[in-house]
């Protein structure tokens, strides 16, 4: 093993001169080229979170249901009755920008490995997607290929894609966001951890062969996208969902033998990351021989083996003497399996290639003792925020109950509503989710578009061919959702991030679930930009506060920085993945009206709304300005609690979050989902008409209630939400329009279901 003799090209490794000096200090010498390549990927933002780690430590991470928190491959929560749920979110933003099909597909494959590596069988997938305007053919192609990639991997591997969200904004042009969340139920007696243990225990390489695909993928994901980003296509991994399915089954079968001491999937930074993290977490070392790694290409150098991110690969630490037993399982599933290393006492990562030791570095130097940057925080909001907060809604064209009076015409409220429903962010995503298999495994209770959150039956998937456990054995269910609003966070990072957590919990409450915990994906620009770092820091504060208030600890997540191209950064976009528990499947709710004559109520207050950052401002006036409404977390808890109680008492027949698009859009969505009209009167108040109809805010839920239950329902509301609920009207029939009037009965808008459908299903039409 020799040291580098010439000055290294630090830029190629994504390292600064100061970081190189830290490496020299930790090693007591210069790293050789192979070691330097390993440090380059392990010290990248994608792997070590050097800019975000100080901010993440403020998140609440413990709770009575938390079994596994941050630090493992995924978080785990206790659902009771011996059921444990693993869940996690990951991003594949940069790869999807340059190779959308494979970038998105391998994002699905990677998050599934995080789940089953713990010993959990994957039961559901969700995704959160952001694209630039679909009028641009490139953005439309990106979207189509991303959706195709997600559908391909999920459908082939046999895991249903049950929900998610899609937003469209110019800031995501050329820099799409592809965040994927997976859920799984534990099948092993205990969680399979990733810390290597037992000196002398063999290390098994299992799964697919290793090639040159995905080399330096972690470094690629830790830098800004270049204008000529297509040259980075070799950094994008290539997945095989059929092989991935075999890997799921082989791993779960191997874990059931209890011969596996530790497991780690090979994702970002491949063999480098897996060996370093397993050794560092266990306080031991790993000796690894690259000559024993099954390769799909000849002539690969040591650094290529180490940095390859070929998919569907795992490292296992196995009890000594039981390696043959475990390898036989993988061979039977048609997978590679070989003894490629062993656990050693000295806490080093020692890599051998062609009979020589090519790497010998402390495991902690690669995985734990990495750079950390605590950057100064702006003393006050940046200029763009201060300017936005000065915006006055009175500068908009005048409006009355007829509509908006523009210089050349009056835009009726019916036209405004239809224009909003046709905007890609609010429009139906049926064209997208129709491509996903959301029924495979036969546990999806609420399909995409039916409710504010996905609902998945809790039923063991451990059965033989031709054997299916009875449905009546499943009483409980899991609810899951993904939520984020980049515009709100751009205009107010602290309140916008709080609102994302609150909306996720609200969506779970709307289907009848108790919110349990979250996983978060922080999508931001370059932290080296003081404005972006300020956005990131305040968003983390907002998430932490909301999670504490709502009792939803953070069990893990992902940070994706440097989401920018040239001088154009995306909006700061934290995406919250939240899971909840439904104690009894008899008491769940969809978002659509159920019965003609049901009473329509609004829980919460219209006074908590704002036009700042609204879809109304963006779609009608092409403005992104103002200040989003602050989140009253105490009111949020009471509104959600009232909704859940009403569902479990059998009073509430439908429930729908009132957020993006405001009250008028929420009413239209309930009509569309239920196939029925409604007649509604706005409560008396002093709000301008545009804010009353389309203002956005938190802590509001639209529900429909059995009229026979009006008395106990309203008595309960008055005790729990005094003065903060309104009876708006009643549900109509399939032939009735959506009618909104003033409190005095004067007409505001009347739109037929056919017109609503024509607008709502137009944005993503085939």
Curated annotation (Swiss-Prot):
GO terms for cellular component: cytoplasm. It catalyses: N(2)-formyl-N(1)-(5-phospho-beta-D-ribosyl)glycinamide + L-glutamine + ATP + H2O = 2-formamido-N(1)-(5-O-phospho-beta-D-ribosyl)acetamidine + L-glutamate + ADP + phosphate + H(+). It is found in: Cytoplasm. Its EC number is 6.3.5.3. Keywords: ATP-binding, Cytoplasm, Ligase, Magnesium, Metal-binding, Nucleotide-binding, Purine biosynthesis. Mg(2+) 1 binds at residues 90, 558. InterPro entries: PRibForGlyAmidine_synth_PurL (IPR010074), PurL_linker (IPR041609), PurM-like_C_dom (IPR010918), PurM-like_C_sf (IPR036676), PurM-like_N (IPR016188), PurM-like_N_sf (IPR036921). ATP binds at residues 49, 88, 520, 557. GO terms for biological process: 'de novo' IMP biosynthetic process. One of its GO terms (molecular function) is phosphoribosylformylglycinamidine synthase activity. Mg(2+) 2 binds at residues 114, 265. The active site is at residues 46, 92. SUPFAM superfamilies: PurM C-terminal domain-like (SSF56042), PurM N-terminal domain-like (SSF55326). Pfam families: AIRS, AIRS_C, FGAR-AT_linker. Substrate binds at residues 91-94, 113, 237, 309-311, 560. Pathway: Purine metabolism; IMP biosynthesis via de novo pathway; 5-amino-1-(5-phospho-D-ribosyl)imidazole from N(2)-formyl-N(1)-(5-phospho-D-ribosyl)glycinamide: step 1/2. Part of the phosphoribosylformylglycinamidine synthase complex involved in the purines biosynthetic pathway. Catalyzes the ATP-dependent conversion of formylglycinamide ribonucleotide (FGAR) and glutamine to yield formylglycinamidine ribonucleotide (FGAM) and glutamate. The FGAM synthase complex is composed of three subunits. PurQ produces an ammonia molecule by converting glutamine to glutamate. PurL transfers the ammonia molecule to FGAR to form FGAM in an ATP-dependent manner. Belongs to the FGAMS family. PANTHER family: PHOSPHORIBOSYLFORMYLGLYCINAMIDINE SYNTHASE SUBUNIT PURL. Monomer. Part of the FGAM synthase complex composed of 1 PurL, 1 PurQ and 2 PurS subunits. This is Phosphoribosylformylglycinamidine synthase subunit PurL. The lineage of its organism: Bacteria, Bacillati, Cyanobacteriota, Cyanophyceae, Synechococcales. The gene is purL.
């Amino acid at each position: 093993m020799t040291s580098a003799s010439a000055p290294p090209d630090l830029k190629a490794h994504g390292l600064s001169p100061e970081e190189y000096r830290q490496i020299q200090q930790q090693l007591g010498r210069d790293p050789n080229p192979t070691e330097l390549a390993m440090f380059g990927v392990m010290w990248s933002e994608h792997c070590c979170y050097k800019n975000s780690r100080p901010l993440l430590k403020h998140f609440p991470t413990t709770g009575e249901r938390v079994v596994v928190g941050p630090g493992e491959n995924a978080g785990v929560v206790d659902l009771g009755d011996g059921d444990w749920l693993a869940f996690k979110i990951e991003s594949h933003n940069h790869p999807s920008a340059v190779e959308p099909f494979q970038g998105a597909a391998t994002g699905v494959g990677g998050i599934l490995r995080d789940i089953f590596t713990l010993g959990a069988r994957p039961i559901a997938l969700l995704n959160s997607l952001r694209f630039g305007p679909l009028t641009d053919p490139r953005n439309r192609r990106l979207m189509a290929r991303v959706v195709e990639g997600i559908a391909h991997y999920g459908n082939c591997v046999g895991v249903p894609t049950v929900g998610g969200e899609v937003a469209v904004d110019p800031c995501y042009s050329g820099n799409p966001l592809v965040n994927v969340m997976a859920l799984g139920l534990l099948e092993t007696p205990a969680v399979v951890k990733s810390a290597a243990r037992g000196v002398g225990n063999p290390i098994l390489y299992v799964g697919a062969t290793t090639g040159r695909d995905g080399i330096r993928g972690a470094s690629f994901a830790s830098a800004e996208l270049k204008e000529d980003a297509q040259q980075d296509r070799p950094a994008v991994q290539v997945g095989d969902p059929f092989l991935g399915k075999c890997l799921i089954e082989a791993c779960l079968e191997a874990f059931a033998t209890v011969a596996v001491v530790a497991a780690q999937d090979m994702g970002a930074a491949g063999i480098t990351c897996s060996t370093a993290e397993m050794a560092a977490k266990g306080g031991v070392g790993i000796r690894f021989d690259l000559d024993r790694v099954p390769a799909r290409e000849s002539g690969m150098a040591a650094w290529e083996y180490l940095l390859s991110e070929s998919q569907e690969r795992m490292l296992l630490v196995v009890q000594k003497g039981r390696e043959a037993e475990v390898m036989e399982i993988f061979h039977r599933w048609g997978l590679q399996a070989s003894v490629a290393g062993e656990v050693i006492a000295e806490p080093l990562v020692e890599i051998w290639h062609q009979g020589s030791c090519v790497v010998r570095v402390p495991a902690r130097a690669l995985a734990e003792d990495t750079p950390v940057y605590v950057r100064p925080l702006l003393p006050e909001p940046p200029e763009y925020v201060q300017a936005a907060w000065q915006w006055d809604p009175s500068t908009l064209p005048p409006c009355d109950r007829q509509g908006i009076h523009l210089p050349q015409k009056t835009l009726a409220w019916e036209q405004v509503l239809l224009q909003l429903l046709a905007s890609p962010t609010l429009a139906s995503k049926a064209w997208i989710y129709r491509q996903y298999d959301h029924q495979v495994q036969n546990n999806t209770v609420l399909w995409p578009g039916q409710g504010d959150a996905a609902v998945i039956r809790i039923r063991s998937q451990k059965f033989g061919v031709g054997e299916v456990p009875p449905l009546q054995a499943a009483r409980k269910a899991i609810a899951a959702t993904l939520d984020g609003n980049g515009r709100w966070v751009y205009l107010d990072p602290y309140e916008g991030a709080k609102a994302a957590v609150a909306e996720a919990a609200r969506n779970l409450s709307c289907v009848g679930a108790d919110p349990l915990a979250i996983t978060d994906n922080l999508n931001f620009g370059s932290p080296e930009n003081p404005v972006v770092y300020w956005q990131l820091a305040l968003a983390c504060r907002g998430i932490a506060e909301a999670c504490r208030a709502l009792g939803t600890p953070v069990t893990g997540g992902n940070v994706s920085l440097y989401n920018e191209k040239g001088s154009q950064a995306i909006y700061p976009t934290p995406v919250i993945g939240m899971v909840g528990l439904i104690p009894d499947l008899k008491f769940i709710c969809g978002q659509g009206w159920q019965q003609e004559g049901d009473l329509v109520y609004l829980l919460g207050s219209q006074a908590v709304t704002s036009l700042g950052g609204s879809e109304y401002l963006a779609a009608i006036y092409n403005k992104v300005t103002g200040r989003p409404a602050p989140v009253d977390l105490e009111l949020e808890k009471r509104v959600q609690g009232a909704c859940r109680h009403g569902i479990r008492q059998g009073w509430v027949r439908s429930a729908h979050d009132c957020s993006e698009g405001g009250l008028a859009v929420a009413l239209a969505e309930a009509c569309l989902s239920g196939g029925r009209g409604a007649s509604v009167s706005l409560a008396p108040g002093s709000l301008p008409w545009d804010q009353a109809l389309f203002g956005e805010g938190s802590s509001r839920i639209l529900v429909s209630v059995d009229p026979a239950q009006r008395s106990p329902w309203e008595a309960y509301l008055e005790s729990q939400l005094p003065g903060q609920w309104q009876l708006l009207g009643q549900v109509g029939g399939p032939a009735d329009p959506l009618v909104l009037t003033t409190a005095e009965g004067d007409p505001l808008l009347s739109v037929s279901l056919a017109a609503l459908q024509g607008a709502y299903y137009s944005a993503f039409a085939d």
